[in-house]
Amino acid sequence: MQSGHYNRRQSRRQRISSNTTDSPRHTHGTRYRSTNWYTHPPQILSNSETLVAVQELLNSEMDQDSSSDASDDFPGYALHHSTYNGSEQNTSTSRHENRIFKLTEREANEEININTDAIDDEGEAEEGEAEEDAIDDEGEAEEGEAEEDAIDDEGEAEEGEAEEDAIDDEGEAEEGEAEEGEAEEGEAEEDAIDDEGEAEEDAAEEDAIDDEGEAEEDYFSVSQVCSRDADEVYFTLDPEISYSTDLRIAKVMEPAVSKELNVSKRCVEPVTLTGSMLAHNGFDESWFAMRECTRREYITVQGLYDPIHLRYQFDTSRMTPPQILRTIPALPNMTLGELLLIFPIEFMAQPISIERILVEDVFLDRRASSKTHKYGPRWNSVYALPYNAGKMYVQHIPGFYDVSLRAVGQGTAIWHHMILSTAACAISNRISHGDGLGFLLDAAIRISANCIFLGRNDNFGVGDPCWLEDHLAGLPREAVPDVLQVTQLVLPNRGPTVAIMRGFFGALAYWPELRIAISEPSTSLVRYATGHMELAEWFLFSRTHSLKPQFTPTEREMLASFFTLYVTLGGGMLNWICRATAMYLAAPYHSRSAYIAVCESLPYYYIPVNSDLLCDLEVLLLGEVDLPTVCESYATIAHELTGYEAVRTAATNFMIEFADCYKESETDLMVSAYLGAVLLLQRVLGHANLLLLLLSGAALYGGCSIYIPRGILDAYNTLMLAASPLYAHQTLTSFWKDRDDAMQTLGIRPTTDVLPKEQDRIVQASPIEMNFRFVGLETIYPREQPIPSVDLAENLMQYRNEILGLDWKSVAMHLLRKY
């Protein structure tokens, strides 16, 4: 079966076959590290100077050559930073000069946006010079060919070749490569190639040669573009391949088929399931036939690498300090060497340039921005997002994605103050990304042990009132490693650093250093899901406050459904992490067949997160809803749906990546996907916690009737207990107190009044693309039997300490007034 994410196998073969340089071998996978390192002394700017520089650059337009109008034909640009050659000490400013690469029209149509890294200027032949001379092309462009033949003795320059090296004493012009789009492992080879006149077989065809026949200065047309991963490593993108992350539908038992086919109709006989592809069940063709998969999820490269019109004029060559890896408390009897043999994370702990951190911060902000928000780097900033101080009006505005710009700005500022800025202040310059990696690994082992301890394996039938509660599934006894066999719940590790990383509603996913450290494609997947969830939370914060915590009836019903789905999704991710951890820590004599649920990618192409329970709930809760109409009328629901779809897609692709890397023995990329899933799980838990607190406020403080499926609060409580080493649950009373304190600090006052028309500025939020499709419209759950539901306010009283907090008596008074 063809893997959908980045066409990984093909791109790796291309990187291996095309690499002819002497660059040192990278420590993991088949990739190669760039030979460039930032060695020149730093120029340290103050925070205010940095912010001013970034703001000016964000608002400025990109410089363009007066002879070309690239903005009419090419929507995206990639920023190229020239860097030092490690063997030279040249301090010429041309080595730090930013160059902008112009994308071809074909690549722009394929939505391939790139962020190219520095190209080495190999200037050994010309000491102190790194300037490239753009020579006008003489001749006609021969479409579709990349001419690499030697220039004849008369010195006639053929079209498509940029002469970059000096002409030798005999007067022969050495040939300069013009393979537009081919960047080999981060190095655009611009040296002279031999003039034997033989054209290489693997030359990339020039799809878009400049119509005017001019090689414009400061631009370099490419047809085989390059991108980079988190460790300054190039990998090549082929324009002939569609770079999209798909959950493809292939015919069962024919994994080599890449054509999208429908799975056969589900069985008509009743089926009793004991769980979703448990380790001891094995694969059964009839199990796949139970569902008709008609949905395809995707992440386009445009969603992963947004173009950034930004050029830093200040020195950003500083690096983060060297990272120190330590043993983890969850495995006290294991030395660091033994730990790294099992979990090879040393390549993730390398220093990261400040420039990469700033760019990654802006990437996430662009992902989370919409028409109602301006973007800019926020994690390392000290200023608050723009908002209107004064009264906060939270009434719903009907219309086509209509929202109040005042309320959205205020809600975003409150969210930023409560979550992002507080987490950034606690983490920046105090905690290194090496400590973050150690925390994720330690927490993953602890929550896996808790999952096994709390997993019941009682095999409740589908439709049983407890079927939602029993969504944590333990492992068979023979598949549980000794280190995961515990007799009591494993508590979180102690210390202020751990407390910081467990808090703030799972804010570690917003930490740019940590996202970069886990390396691609995990960096892009976390950014993709986190950006959509962040935008949804902005709109959620703009709809309520302590004086008016109610939502509209439609919003309450939909948010209750999304809360149920997020809890189920989190349980599925926790089950997968538990099995992956057990496979890592299992003794060599353990049969790998016990961990087939994480070593085979086939199930995940059919069912998201390999959870039939999640697929059933999607149909039962959202199948009868007119989603396009609801999303057009409620921008909050629209972005909540988009966020859920993004999380489901990213989580499934983590699991596919892990299984594919296992088959290819890519141990470094396996642990990258493993830690990426742990990081995303923390953000999922934080978002589910936030949804419950908002719904609980509407039920207890606002007196609204909200109904949730029976057993979902039990499942939520079990999930939070198991994941407590990774995420610290926020209680209802502490959340609303912190929110009121944040509003007071920002000068925002809650009010129940209606926004005056003279202050009412209605804008349209960014419409969403309705790509959401259901898997298996005929559910395994009996459709004629409705899901039993309970009142949220009544059910909350069973969790006075766990969910409501210590001040639950004051909350109970509101419940008594309601009845």
Curated annotation (Swiss-Prot):
<keyword id="KW-0805">Transcription regulation</keyword>
<keyword id="KW-0804">Transcription</keyword>
<keyword id="KW-0677">Repeat</keyword>
<keyword id="KW-0920">Virion tegument</keyword>
<dbReference type="GO" id="GO:0030430">
    <property type="term" value="C:host cell cytoplasm"/>
</dbReference>
<feature type="short sequence motif" description="Nuclear export signal">
    <location>
        <begin position="785"/>
        <end position="807"/>
    </location>
</feature>
<dbReference type="InterPro" id="IPR005029">
    <property type="entry name" value="Herpes_UL47"/>
</dbReference>
<feature type="repeat" description="1-4">
    <location>
        <begin position="165"/>
        <end position="190"/>
    </location>
</feature>
<comment type="similarity">
    <text>Belongs to the alphaherpesvirinae HHV-1 UL47 family.</text>
</comment>
<feature type="repeat" description="1-3">
    <location>
        <begin position="149"/>
        <end position="164"/>
    </location>
</feature>
<protein>
    <recommendedName>
        <fullName>Tegument protein UL47 homolog</fullName>
    </recommendedName>
</protein>
<keyword id="KW-0426">Late protein</keyword>
<keyword id="KW-1048">Host nucleus</keyword>
<comment type="function">
    <text>Tegument protein that can bind to various RNA transcripts. Plays a role in the attenuation of selective viral and cellular mRNA degradation by modulating the activity of host shutoff RNase ORF17/VHS. Also plays a role in the primary envelopment of virions in the perinuclear space, probably by interacting with two nuclear egress proteins ORF24 and ORF27.</text>
</comment>
<feature type="repeat" description="1-2">
    <location>
        <begin position="133"/>
        <end position="148"/>
    </location>
</feature>
<comment type="subunit">
    <text>Interacts with US3 kinase. Interacts with ORF24 and ORF27; these interactions seem important for efficient virion nuclear egress. Interacts with ORF17/VHS. Interacts with ORF9.</text>
</comment>
<feature type="region of interest" description="6 X 16 AA approximate tandem repeats">
    <location>
        <begin position="117"/>
        <end position="218"/>
    </location>
</feature>
<feature type="compositionally biased region" description="Basic residues">
    <location>
        <begin position="1"/>
        <end position="15"/>
    </location>
</feature>
<feature type="compositionally biased region" description="Acidic residues">
    <location>
        <begin position="62"/>
        <end position="72"/>
    </location>
</feature>
<dbReference type="Pfam" id="PF03362">
    <property type="entry name" value="Herpes_UL47"/>
</dbReference>
<dbReference type="GO" id="GO:0042025">
    <property type="term" value="C:host cell nucleus"/>
</dbReference>
<keyword id="KW-1035">Host cytoplasm</keyword>
<feature type="compositionally biased region" description="Polar residues">
    <location>
        <begin position="32"/>
        <end position="42"/>
    </location>
</feature>
<feature type="compositionally biased region" description="Polar residues">
    <location>
        <begin position="82"/>
        <end position="93"/>
    </location>
</feature>
<feature type="compositionally biased region" description="Acidic residues">
    <location>
        <begin position="118"/>
        <end position="219"/>
    </location>
</feature>
<dbReference type="GO" id="GO:0006355">
    <property type="term" value="P:regulation of DNA-templated transcription"/>
</dbReference>
<feature type="compositionally biased region" description="Basic and acidic residues">
    <location>
        <begin position="94"/>
        <end position="109"/>
    </location>
</feature>
<dbReference type="GO" id="GO:0003723">
    <property type="term" value="F:RNA binding"/>
</dbReference>
<feature type="repeat" description="1-5">
    <location>
        <begin position="191"/>
        <end position="206"/>
    </location>
</feature>
<feature type="region of interest" description="Disordered">
    <location>
        <begin position="1"/>
        <end position="42"/>
    </location>
</feature>
<feature type="region of interest" description="Disordered">
    <location>
        <begin position="58"/>
        <end position="221"/>
    </location>
</feature>
<feature type="short sequence motif" description="Nuclear localization signal">
    <location>
        <begin position="11"/>
        <end position="31"/>
    </location>
</feature>
<feature type="repeat" description="1-1">
    <location>
        <begin position="117"/>
        <end position="132"/>
    </location>
</feature>
<dbReference type="GO" id="GO:0019033">
    <property type="term" value="C:viral tegument"/>
</dbReference>
<keyword id="KW-0694">RNA-binding</keyword>
<keyword id="KW-0946">Virion</keyword>
<feature type="repeat" description="1-6; truncated">
    <location>
        <begin position="207"/>
        <end position="218"/>
    </location>
</feature>
